[in-house]
């Protein structure tokens, strides 16, 4: 939540309607 608040521009909307931080996605992929 902190990341989304600090970097709203890094938030992406997924096809299922959820919003996830690009940073979080990168961490999950890595």
Swiss-Prot record:
Keyword Phosphoprotein: no
One Gene Ontology biological process: proton transmembrane transport
Class of enzymatic activity (EC top level): translocase
Catalyzed chemical reaction(s): ATP + H2O + 4 H(+)(in) = ADP + phosphate + 5 H(+)(out)
Molecular function per GO: ATP binding
Source domain of life: Eukaryota
The protein's Enzyme Commission number: 7.1.2.2
Keywords, sorted A to Z: ATP-binding, Hydrogen ion transport, Ion transport, Nucleotide-binding, Translocase, Transport
Role played: Catalytic subunit of the peripheral V1 complex of vacuolar ATPase. V-ATPase vacuolar ATPase is responsible for acidifying a variety of intracellular compartments in eukaryotic cells.
UniProt similarity note: Belongs to the ATPase alpha/beta chains family.
Additional notes on this entry: Two separate genes encode the catalytic 70 kDa V-ATPase subunit in psilotum and equisetum.
Oligomer and partners: V-ATPase is a heteromultimeric enzyme composed of a peripheral catalytic V1 complex (main components: subunits A, B, C, D, E, and F) attached to an integral membrane V0 proton pore complex (main component: the proteolipid protein).
Protein name per Swiss-Prot or TrEMBL: V-type proton ATPase catalytic subunit A isoform 1
Organism whose genome encodes this protein: Psilotum nudum
Lineage: Eukaryota, Viridiplantae, Streptophyta, Embryophyta, Tracheophyta
């Amino acid at each position: 939540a902190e990341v989304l608040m600090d970097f709203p521009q890094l938030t992406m909307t997924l096809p299922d309607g959820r919003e996830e931080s690009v940073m979080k996605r990168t961490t999950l992929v890595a």
